[in-house]
Amino acid sequence: GELVERGALTGSQDLVAVDDRATIARMAAIYNAAMDEQIRALGDAVGENYAGASIPGSEKIGDSVQFLREHLAEVPVLVIPVFAGRTENASVFLQASMWGSIVQSVWSFMLALRPRGLGSCWTTVHLHREREMAELLGIPHHYTHAGLFPVAYTQGTDFRPAWRRPVNEVLF
């Protein structure tokens, strides 16, 4: 059965799942090239100069990014959620509707992994090279990638809440 919920805009959405080792290795190479582009684009805004560096535990995020870079080719399955249509020239309403629908699907997918002992994270850096990834996987150019999700067994199941800003700092 279907494991993901969809929003009101239920146009064509798909989860492209890849478990072929050679293809995953090529995907990892594209991801790492895109990460190099991202790092170059940040310029001096890295390390302690990064905007998020003041968030408690932010060094763990950097460590996780580096670990994923080094081990992405070893992940059992990589998933790219896609939806039909491009948002670049769409109205704000249509953009929000398209993204709002795929976000529900992806979040449901990630929650469905948990009781199976699996986990993932939402990565977007490959989008610097979305066309290259699409060509590798045969994804039509009129589909938008919503991210890249490495899927693997978790190390334990004792997940804890992450640090969050106090609610009075985020509500207007």
Predicted region positions:
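Small-aliphatic-rich amphipathic alpha-helix that forms the alpha element of a beta-alpha
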Residues: 1-3, 79-135
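N-terminal amphipathic, basic helical "cap/leader" segment at the start of enzyme domains
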Residues: 1-72
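Short, surface-exposed beta-edge/turn micro-motifs
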Residues: 12-13, 75-78, 145-146
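Helix-biased detector of long, well-ordered alpha-helical tracts
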Residues: 46-50, 63-67, 77, 82-93
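Short, electropositive alpha-helical surface patch
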Residues: 131-146
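C-terminal helix-cap and adjacent tail motif
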Residues: 144-172
